[in-house]
């Protein structure tokens, strides 16, 4: 196993492996907010996100949705296909919350009849600004056909995840996706899907089961992530 670091982000490190085109992802215990301005470490967070992401990506694969995920290899690590990340954060919104509620002057919790898909330019120095299709084309991030493919994939993923989280008695409020191109130019789902990247509310109590408990100081992060993992395991068995 090689320890040559390829990339380090806020929540993960990527390392080379002996196999060409395969990387090792190591999940960190760090949690960040305000685009990295606020940072804390929570013992066990990396393990929780690795397990949750591994289960969700496996579930998506069973539904016919391809991703970079290969398999988990330890409590905090997984193997993934190497992709070139497209610098877009793709946000799918099913319920008004967060920045969208503020931007549109709506109350949090208002259902969105047809999910809204948004693009954000993945650039920390600019605080990941909201952009439209014309910006994407101007920045040469993706072609029109690729944007259509990404949107369709995001909506397909949303459908599968909504059904999954409903079984867990959780409302999928919104979530962030990232995509990458493999060596052949195919677009694959990448990054992670976890309470770090999703807003999740308990269907009965509206308790927040995601990183908002850290952002807003309203609960224990590892407790709610553990709750999500336990519910996920129950419906997967």
UniProtKB/Swiss-Prot annotation:
Catalytic activity as recorded in UniProt: 5-amino-1-(5-phospho-D-ribosyl)imidazole-4-carboxylate + L-aspartate + ATP = (2S)-2-[5-amino-1-(5-phospho-beta-D-ribosyl)imidazole-4-carboxamido]succinate + ADP + phosphate + 2 H(+)
Claim: DNA-binding is one of the keywords in the record: no
Coiled-coil region list: none
Domain of life of the organism encoding this protein: Bacteria
One GO term of the biological process aspect: 'de novo' IMP biosynthetic process
Keywords: ATP-binding, Ligase, Nucleotide-binding, Purine biosynthesis
E.C. number(s) listed in UniProt: 6.3.2.6
SUPFAM superfamilies referenced in this protein's UniProt entry, alphabetically: SAICAR synthase-like
Matches recorded under PANTHER family: MULTIFUNCTIONAL PROTEIN ADE2, SI:DKEY-6E2.2
Protein name: Phosphoribosylaminoimidazole-succinocarboxamide synthase
Native organism: Listeria monocytogenes serotype 4a (strain HCC23)
């Amino acid at each position: 196993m090689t320890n040559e670091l390829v990339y380090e982000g806020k929540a993960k490190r990527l390392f080379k492996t002996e196999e060409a085109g395969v990387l090792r992802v190591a999940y960190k215990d760090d949690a960040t907010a305000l685009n990295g301005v606020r940072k804390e470490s929570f013992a066990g967070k990396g393990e929780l996100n690795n397990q949750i992401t591994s289960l969700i990506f496996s579930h998506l694969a069973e539904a016919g949705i391809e991703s970079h995920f290969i398999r988990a290899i330890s409590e905090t690590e997984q193997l993934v296909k190497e992709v070139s990340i497209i610098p877009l954060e793709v946000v799918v919104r099913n319920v008004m919350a967060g920045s969208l509620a503020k931007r549109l002057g709506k109350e949090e919790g208002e259902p969105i009849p047809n999910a809204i898909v948004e693009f954000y330019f993945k650039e920390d120095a600019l605080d990941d600004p909201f952009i439209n299709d014309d910006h994407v084309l101007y920045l040469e991030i993706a072609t029109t056909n690729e944007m259509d493919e990404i949107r369709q994939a995001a909506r397909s993923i949303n459908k599968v995840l909504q059904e999954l989280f409903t079984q867990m008695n959780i409302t999928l409020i919104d979530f962030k996706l990232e995509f990458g191109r493999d060596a052949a130019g195919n677009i694959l789902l990448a990054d992670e899907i976890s309470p770090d990247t999703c807003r999740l509310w308990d269907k009965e109590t509206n308790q927040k089961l995601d990183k908002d408990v850290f952002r807003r100081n309203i609960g224990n992060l590892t407790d709610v992530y553990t709750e999500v993992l336990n519910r996920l395991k129950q419906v997967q068995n």
